[in-house]
């Protein structure tokens, strides 16, 4: 049996082993836990919290799963190379539980709902003081189809909502939700923690350029030195209220905030083009957010480079057809689609809407087309899978900026090479 098949079959059994020892270290640490969950946007929220709370907290960067969070508590890194590392981790966990302890007052932890029972597994252990439920959508939908087939839920959306609800249910003090989400409102109706609905429509003004964003609320302006979607008004209002609750100073100037790779990063490109890099992932909820940002962005010549939406299972065709309307609403000068799903489903829908698109399965052909066509006055906005980060790397004005792109780890480099994409 391969390691991958073993992990899938015995996922939670093995995860319980690491959680057991992590709990020993966790009890010695005894932090105030702030949990961040949702279908998309978790990492951006984490980054904003780090900007405000600083060194008073430990942050679970690159760790959000049933394995990742216990590893993080124990001060261990997960699998980054040889599978033999599992043996070392199994041996190291008991010793780390005795000798390792974080000392920060707060633990800001990202919790994913990638598979059924994962959020539940972590929520019942960590029992956070505060939960921030950022979003709800059909990310990892394919993982929840069995739950629907087995009759546990009517549809995939209901199954995903139920999974995320485990976190608010196990929260002791405060739960922040989107006031516009009927799913979140219904899911948190009877929990014991205080529910704080955040109204994004209280935002007074939103101005976005390829290299900056300003959000205005009342007399306060929140400034970023990169483009951000309008949707993160939710994050801003949450962070401001949370800092007041924690009795910590709130800083509305986010110009020095370090953003995670592939989350609306800004780069200068060859010939002077502007590059907006949102290539980290692609769910319909994040696609909607980024394409809305593109529509509102102050830029003369907008090009969209869109990759496939993955992990959609039986919803794949429907989601990619919906994508066409979102793209058309931007009124882009050019559209480049990369991937079999966008080529099969999105391109024909765009044609019906009167939007021409260049569709290819090969990132190299997309790059070739872009390099031949740009004049230097364009703003290229990237969103989706299919190794768009490789295309961006080849378009950078400064090759050193490549280290700021997503998927720099060895495994990702090897996957790109298997596609013939050198780095």
What do these predicted regions represent?
Residues 29-31, 103-105, 123-274, 299-300, ...:
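Acidic, Mg2+-coordinating active-site environments of NTP-dependent enzymes
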Residues 36, 44-61:
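A conserved segment at the C-terminal end of the G1
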Residues 112-116, 181-182, 281-282, 363-364:
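Short beta->alpha connector loops
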